[in-house]
Amino acid sequence: LDQPDGHADYLQAHIPGAVYVDLDTELAQHGAAAEGRHPLPSHATLQAAARRWGVNDGDIVVAYDDAGSVAAARAWWLLRRTGVDVRVLDGGLGFWTATGRPVQSGEGVMPEGDVTLVESLVGELSIDEAAALPAHGVLLDVRVAPRYRGETEPIDPIAGHVPGAINLPAASHIAADGTMVDSAALRAAFAEAGVTEGTQVAAYCGSGINAAHTALALAEVGIEAQVYSGSWSQWSNTPGRPVAVGGTPDGDVRAG
């Protein structure tokens, strides 16, 4: 599994037996701007994709990528919430090859699977729920700090963050070798952001990809998190939503 342009890299080298997963067409779908850049795939789309990957009922699925497990985390989150036993290979392809393990080239094809996914909204946060969460829980904005502060916005129409959201970049959970930082460091970072066991917490990013990685990091330390999948790309394209700028959660709030 890789970023949308990763198929060529996959064809050159991948873990033996691995099947390529397309982030844009199988782990997301195209929609209106008001839905965000990476709307969730329909249940039918995800199930058809999982069967194409060769997933059968009862299988353990392992997802990996070569970008800090960010895209793999999206697959993990989607499959986990639909009843699949799924794991993420820590460190991905880079760690695999760095430790001398074999790779193969070419297209990997698996026999059609028969998995039946559970239809579920577990773990997903709507735009209204995201707006309300800071009043009684923690909403994490996992984008880089300049985007959170509203100093720059390279993709979406408005810069800033959801009022009340706390900034904790997803990249801070990834070590230099592409593996997840250790559990003690994760717990300390989340605790500093006000997240401990029992906290209602959700994450958002630009379009719902990096936020899934934060949900994975939270699960690593035993904390269940929701993902606001529409994320900033939906919020900033929705008229009337207030926008906060600056380095604090409530910052300078402006009308949307």
Predicted regions and their residues:
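Cytosolic catalytic domains that perform sulfur/thiol-centered chemistry
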Residues: 1-256
